[in-house]
Amino acid sequence: MATSDIQIDNKRTRVTRWSFEVGEDTGQHIHEYDYVVVPMEDGQLKIVDQDGTVLISDLIKGKSYYRNKGVNHNVINHNDFPFSFVEIEFK
C-alpha cells in the first residue's frame, strides 16, 4: 500500500505527499474535495476507476493537474521505480 504523509491540514486545505514503491497502490477511494496533484518525478500511474476502466497516465515532474471532487479510483505505481506526488485538496 502506498504511504501518505499529511504535511498540512487546516480548515481550507490538506496537503499530502503520496509515496509508492513499485506496484503499490492507494486502494479504491472517493475524493471528498477538488484537488491538484504535483508529480515529484516523471513516470506513469495506472488509474482504475469504480467500473474497472483502466487508464495509464503519463506524468511530468512539476506539471500539475486538477480534478473535481467525487473522483472514485485506485492509483497504482506503473513504473519500475518508486514514485511520489503531492496532492493538494481544497476543502
Regions found by a protein language model. Give the residues of each.
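Catalytic phosphate/metal-binding cores of nucleic-acid and nucleotide-processing enzymes, i.e., regions
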Residues: 2, 12
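Local beta-strand/beta-hairpin segments that build beta-sheet-rich folds
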Residues: 5-8
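Conserved short histidine dyad/triad with adjacent acidic residue
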Residues: 14-30, 49, 69
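Short, flexible surface segments
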Residues: 22, 41, 61-62
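Short beta-strand His + acidic residue motifs that chelate non-heme Fe in jelly-roll/DSBH
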Residues: 26-28, 46-47, 72-79
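Short, conserved beta-strand element in jelly-roll/cupin
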Residues: 30-46
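Short acidic-glycine-tyrosine-enriched beta hairpin
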Residues: 51-69
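Ligand-binding loop in jelly-roll beta-barrel domains
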Residues: 70-91
